[in-house]
């Protein structure tokens, strides 16, 4: 299994960051790579088991299932159902932890997945630097550096 782990600190209170990212259907509002998103079958976006179907700005389409969501622990876990990345058993978690020294937020985004061995390094870099760090950088621009 390939593993990706990216962390950062956002200069904004955890509650403010969580309010921005909590909506499982809200990626277009904060992640620059996502053009549009919808929750299938009209389900609530915070219902565990709901499926988001979103389109990236490059035209690619991805479907993901919400596996876990906690307002108390400020995390979201999801799996990829369909993706052009050709990964298997992809499960990721985005987690926030309050940093009380300065009222900042420690953010972590991790994933595990299966893929062809010759693609592992490329996928780890694309997901880590492009998707995860790209999302963190956008949140920093929107909420504080």
Short names for language-model regions:
Residues 6-8, 62-68, 91-98:
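Hydrophobic/aromatic beta-strand elements that line small-molecule binding cavities or substrate pockets
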Residues 12, 58, 98, 113-115:
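Beta-strand elements of well-folded, non-transmembrane domains
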Residues 2, 58-60, 88, 103:
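Short acidic/polar mixed-charge low-complexity motifs
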Residues 38-85, 134, 138, 142-145:
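Glycine-rich portal/gate segments that line the openings of hydrophobic small-molecule binding cavities
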Residues 14-15, 68-72, 96-106:
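A short, structured loop/turn motif at beta-sheet edges
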Residues 1-44:
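Hydrophobic ligand-binding cavity/cleft-lining segments
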Residues 106, 112-145:
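A conserved amphipathic terminal alpha-helix motif
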Residues 90-92, 109-111:
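One face of beta-strands
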